[in-house]
Amino acid sequence: MSASCLDLISAPPQPDSDRMDRALNPGRQNSPDTAGELTLLHTAPGGLGMALEEELAMLTGDREDELQESAPETPVSGQDSDLLSLFRQKEKDLVLAAKLGKALLERNQDLTKQYDKMTKDLNDRLELLEQEKHELRRRLESREGEWEGRVAELETDVQHLQGELERHQLQLRDADREKSRAISELSEQNHRLLEQLSRAAEVEKQLSTQVHSLRDDFKEKSISSNQHMTRLETLQAEIRMLSERKQDLERRVCAVLEENQQLQNTVEELRERTLELEKHCHHKDLQKILPETLLTIIKLKTNYSQKKKKTEHLILHTRRAHTHLCRAPSEVQSCMGSLSCVWCIQRRKDCDLFLLQLRLQLWEAYCQVRSICSQLRGNDITDSALSTDSSMDESSETLSAKDVPTGSLHSSLLELRRLTQNLLDGNESTVALLSVEVSSSREENERLRAMTEVHEPNEQLQSAIRDRDEAIAKKKAVEMELAKCKIDIMSLNSBQLLDAIQQKLNLSQQLEAWQDDMHRVIDQQLMDKHQEEWKDPPFSFSRRGAAASRPTQRLADRDKPLFSFFKKN
């Protein structure tokens, strides 16, 4: 549109000379041709503009004024006036044409400038439009690529959804078929479950009878366990009493050791003094002491022979005796070093009494273990050796026949432990069987409940459900009772009895081991004592014997309460 406008403006209609003549001719001013031409000049598209029209109007006005002025001045005289007028008219036309040309040139320059400016603006706008067109084309291509990718993705999604739709339709068809088949199977299972309910009621009755029998068995076992607990308490009391005795003996032995140490210190001091006195008085009293020393040597030889016989007798006696004192070898060694042989004999008698008491206690423990084992095995008749209580008060010769055989107490303890473990395993197995039966019945009941939820329940099914709920409640009660029974059985503290018996067995073994140690200590003490007597000089026997006799006498007097404790026990 702008180009067409510029073409029209750049090519304005320019009147030729004829038109200009007709327009500037005053004679033809009022003619219709001139008027049409003037109108064409005024109405022509893209004409001279408002300035040109104003100039034309001014020129025409000036011409009319001159004609009006020249008319009265010069008379009209034929052809001269016409020529003059024509001449003047032509001059005026030339002036007018020059002015019009000048105006047209100026107008043309303005129009060219406007045209150049407009063409420049047009070119700039065309470049911007081309750039925008290129950008829009690039965006269009990118959008077309995006839309093509999106369309491809949507097509793949549509295909995928179509596949899923077909698969879901197939699954729905399969589900419908399975539903119809399950309905038929459930109807058949309903009939079977009704039959199983009747069988479950019979099984429940059998379980109730078994529970009653188990309850009776548990009552019997609880009674026997109470008896075992009382026996355990008695054994624990005996163990506590023995531990107290042991502590008292240890305290007394410590006191005896201290006294023995003090006596040994005094003996050493006396030895040092006697040696000094012997050195000072050796030369002075040598003649007086010789006959006395000979007599003392003879007496010592006789005493030595007697003591040798007594020591041999004591060695044989100690090898036969079974002393079970719980003391360290060092304590006995220190005591035996300062005590006399008579005191040793008295002590052996006390030890024999204590040994007999320990044997009796071990025998009672062995009898109790055997009786418990027989009760656990279900034997109401005990052994003849266990039922005879009169044999406990017989002499030491009959008691020695009743010594517990080696390993029998340990074997009986192992048997007792095995029987208790079997009892617990049996109870656990019964509980496991009952729990399995209860779980199976519970699964059947859950299956029945699911069936009743699927199908419309009738009166028979509702009554069966009520019976099932009652059976579940009863089974839960039975499970609770069985759990309580299991807890009570496990709470029987059989380990305490076994530990007490094992402790007594260990004590007896320690006493037997101590017996051998005591034999060796006594032999060593006697041998050392005799060797010292033979090694000492002859003149020191009398005073040393007198000095040693006094401490031993004091020690024997102080140790009387210690061994009276064994007699009381």
UniProtKB/Swiss-Prot annotation:
Q: Which UniProt keywords apply?
A: Coiled coil, Cytoplasm, Cytoskeleton, Neurogenesis, Transport
Q: How does it assemble?
A: Part of a tripartite complex with dynein and dynactin, acts an adapter linking the dynein motor complex and dynactin.
Q: Name the job this protein performs.
A: Acts as an adapter protein linking the dynein motor complex to various cargos and converts dynein from a non-processive to a highly processive motor in the presence of dynactin. Facilitates the interaction between dynein and dynactin and activates dynein processivity (the ability to move along a microtubule for a long distance without falling off the track). Predominantly recruits 2 dyneins, which increases both the force and speed of the microtubule motor. Component of secretory vesicle machinery in developing neurons that acts as a regulator of neurite outgrowth.
Q: Coiled coil: which residue ranges? A: 102-283, 458-520
InterPro entries named among the record's database cross-references: Spindly/BICDR_Dynein_Adapter
Compartment list: Cytoplasm, Cytoskeleton, Microtubule organizing center, Centrosome
The residue range of the signal peptide is: none
What GO molecular function terms would the record report?
A: dynactin binding; small GTPase binding
Q: Name one GO biological process term.
A: negative regulation of neuron projection development
Stated name of the protein: BICD family-like cargo adapter 1
**Keyword Lipoprotein on entry:** no
Protein family per UniProt:
Belongs to the BICDR family.
Indicate the principal place this protein occupies in or around the cell. cytoplasm
Give the span(s) annotated as Disordered: 1-36, 385-405, 533-554
The residue numbers the entry assigns to motif CC1 box are 97-101
Q: Does the keyword Cytoplasm apply?
A: yes
| Naturally occurring in which organism (per UniProt) | Danio rerio
Expression by tissue: Highly expressed in developing neural tissues and developing eye.
Q: Which GO terms describe its cellular component?
A: centrosome; cytoplasm
